[in-house]
């Protein structure tokens, strides 16, 4: 009888598909589906980002400083009331236009144009730098105002200050010069003219 029971149990086990070997509560897993090789998909190339151009800085307008200063210097040298040999402080040329001008050598051209005449004795750049340093200003500091220029002129014992500005539209700038008496701050001569571009 034991043989018979074992035979029945074995047959039942074979017929049930071996589900009896699994622990309780588990279900047999599905056989894996057959895999097919994946076809490579075409990846679209990304479009490059839109690059906005960097704006160019405004162009500096070049200036013929010597040609611009010449007529005004002629007027200045013939101005009445200026004693020959007077000490003159030339303030740096100020750009007060609505744009950028090549101002790098403007003050130097102005000093050079005035240096050779006997009407004025120029304050040297070394004296000017030393006076600026004693007042706590940088050597390349542009004074920017008439009162600062007169204060500096007193420091170097100058009798006159030449204050020069370029103003107006950068496409057609105007040059203005003022000769001031240091003692009183009075403008004793002024002249205006176009800037030669």
From Swiss-Prot:
Lineage per the UniProt record: Bacteria, Pseudomonadati, Pseudomonadota, Gammaproteobacteria, Enterobacterales
Region (Disordered): 23-57
Name of this protein: Penicillin-binding protein activator LpoB
Function of the protein: Regulator of peptidoglycan synthesis that is essential for the function of penicillin-binding protein 1B (PBP1b).
Keyword set, alphabetical order: Cell outer membrane, Cell shape, Lipoprotein, Membrane, Palmitate, Peptidoglycan synthesis, Signal
Record carries keyword Hydrolase: no
Lipidation (N-palmitoyl cysteine): 18
Family affiliation: Belongs to the LpoB family.
Coiled coil: none
């Amino acid at each position: 009888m034991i043989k018979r029971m074992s035979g029945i149990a074995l047959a039942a086990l074979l017929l049930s598909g071996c589900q009896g070997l699994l622990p309780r509560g588990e279900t047999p897993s599905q056989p894996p589906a057959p895999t097919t090789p994946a076809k490579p998909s075409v990846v679209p190339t990304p479009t490059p980002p839109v690059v906005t151009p960097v704006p160019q800085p405004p162009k500096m307008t070049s200036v013929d400083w010597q040609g611009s200063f010449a007529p005004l210097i002629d007027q200045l040298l013939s101005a009445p009331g200026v004693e020959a040999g007077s000490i003159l402080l030339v303030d740096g040329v100020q750009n007060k236009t609505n744009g950028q001008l090549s101002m790098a050598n403007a003050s130097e051209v102005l000093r050079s144009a005035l240096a050779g005449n006997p009407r004025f004795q120029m304050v040297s750049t070394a004296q000017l730098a030393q006076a600026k340093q004693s007042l706590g200003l940088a050597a390349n500091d542009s004074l920017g105002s008439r009162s600062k220029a007169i204060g500096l002129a007193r420091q170097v014992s100058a009798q006159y200050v030449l204050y020069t500005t370029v103003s107006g539209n950068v496409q057609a700038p105007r040059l203005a010069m003022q000769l001031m008496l240091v003692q009183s701050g009075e403008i004793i001569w002024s002249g205006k003219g176009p800037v030669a571009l």
